[in-house]
Design a protein with these regions (language model features):
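Juxtamembrane intracellular "pre-TM" segments in multi-pass secondary transporters
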Residues: 2-12, 187-217
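Short amphipathic helix-loop junctions that connect adjacent transmembrane helices
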Residues: 34-47, 228-243
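Helix-breaking motifs and short loop linkers at transmembrane-helix boundaries and internal kinks
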Residues: 44, 76, 97-102, 292-294
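Conserved MFS/SLC helix-loop-helix module at the cytosolic interface between two early adjacent transmembrane helices
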Residues: 62-99
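Helix-to-loop junctions at the C-terminal end of transmembrane segments
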Residues: 65-75, 258-272, 356
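Cytoplasmic helix-loop-helix junction between adjacent transmembrane helices
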Residues: 107-146
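Helix-loop-helix hairpin linking two adjacent transmembrane segments in secondary transporters
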Residues: 141-183
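C-terminal transmembrane helical hairpin of 12-TM major facilitator-type secondary transporters
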Residues: 273-317
Length: 388
């Protein structure tokens, strides 16, 4: 009865403003990501340079996320989110106006360095909500990612009808509007809750390190999946670009449904740590099935396992990080987690590509399942006394 009541508790004031800020930010990202490779090709970029272009965003994000997270702990969440959105707008405009490949890299580096808005938004959500609400709220924040990845590519495709550079200008305009809206409507959450005594014992810091390691080994194979699934689908199932886009659309919708509708009730029933382990097992099993899939039913089953597992595990892990972090350093800790995930997104795609080229079509996913087992082992063996 108490669990049911807690699930139905109203969300704190300001939540939907933060949610809409992240959703609009992800729409802009969704506009750019699918077309960036073809856009770079116009500047004579080869495949390796396109890979570096994608990696440059994650590298900049890896470096600056902890810095901006620490800054948000000192000056507040709102100014850092606003500055990040302004940086995203500048990076998008530079990318759209690029006349040479190096300018394109500059735009992506600026955009990546400004990519701390997500981890700072997660910190703002954690500031607003009581620990028992965080999993639900962070899951719903994850739903904003799904909305962005569904709406963004469609909007980018329409914008591209006006020219290859237009989608980047559209993304820049959206980020500018988002920044203005954040200045007007976004609440400052850093002072919304009274500072409470927090554990600062060494074991708690070890717990945070464990969560970051788990996040890295969870993100690494999933980033490889995102990078090589189109190659796998084309080789084994004759999927066209439109077919691959439809698959990712379905993935985004299912992920949004899981994170927006299921994670709250499931967390209140089972707890974040058990859900993390369940989600990890689902993803590992899904990747094994995907690597072996040669018929459509197995493909759909594998993708369902992966998406449901990731939809459960990701917000559960973020909740555990947020609950383990001292309140005064929550932004820095969540920024460090995002930095670790960004590093995995730098390493994962080229590793998966090498496995595809030199081992076999399904190798990225079979090996990915093995890598994911490392995350499962760490989650199972570490003594995580602060888990809730």
């Amino acid at each position: 009865m108490n669990a049911e009541k807690s699930v139905r508790e109203p969300l704190p004031r300001g939540f939907w403003v933060i949610w809409s800020t992240v959703a609009l930010d992800m729409v802009g990202f969704g506009i750019v990501a699918p077309i960036l490779g073809r856009y770079a090709d116009r500047f004579g970029a080869n495949g390796f340079q396109v890979g570096l272009l994608f990696a440059s965003f994650s590298l900049a994000q890896m470096v600056f996320s902890p810095i901006l997270g620490r800054w948000s702990d000192r000056v507040g969440r709102k100014p850092v989110i606003v500055i990040s959105l302004i940086g995203t707008a500048i990076g998008s405009f530079i990318t759209g106006a690029a006349g040479a490949l190096w300018v394109l890299f500059a735009g992506r580096l600026i955009d990546g360095a400004s990519g701390a808005s997500v981890s700072v938004a997660q910190s703002a959500i954690a500031d607003l909500g009581a620990p028992k609400q965080r999993a639900k709220m962070l899951g719903m924040l994850g739903m904003a990612f799904g909305v962005g990845f569904v709406v963004g590519p469609a909007l980018g495709g329409l914008a591209a009808l006006g020219g290859p550079h237009v989608p980047f200008y559209v993304a820049g305009v959206l980020a500018s509007i988002n920044a203005v809206a954040a200045i007007i409507r976004l609440p400052e959450t850093k002072t919304a809750r009274e500072h409470q005594p927090v554990e600062t014992h060494e074991h708690k810091h070890r717990n945070i390190s464990s969560w970051v390691v788990i996040g890295f080994f969870s993100t690494l194979p999933f980033a490889g999946f995102e990078a090589t699934f189109s190659l796998f689908g084309g080789s084994r199932f004759n999927l066209t670009e439109a077919g691959t886009a439809a698959v990712f659309l379905a993935v985004g919708i299912l992920m949004s449904a899981v994170q927006g509708g299921l994670i709250g009730p499931l967390t209140h029933k089972f707890g974040s740590l058990p859900l993390l382990r369940i989600g990890q097992v689902f993803v590992a099993v899904g990747m094994l099935f995907l690597g072996a899939a040669v018929v459509w039913p197995v493909l759909f089953l594998a993708l369902a396992f992966m998406v449901i597992g990731a939809g459960i595990a990701s917000p559960s892990l973020t909740t555990l990080v947020a609950n383990s972090a001292p309140e005064a350093k929550r932004g820095e800790v969540l920024g460090f987690q995002q930095s670790s995930n960004a590093l995995a997104r730098v390493i994962g795609p080229p590793l998966a590509g090498l496995a595809f080229d030199h081992i076999g079509v399904g190798a990225p996913f079979t090996l990915g399942a093995g890598i994911y087992l490392v995350a499962i082992v760490v989650a199972s063996r570490r003594s995580l006394h602060s888990a809730v």
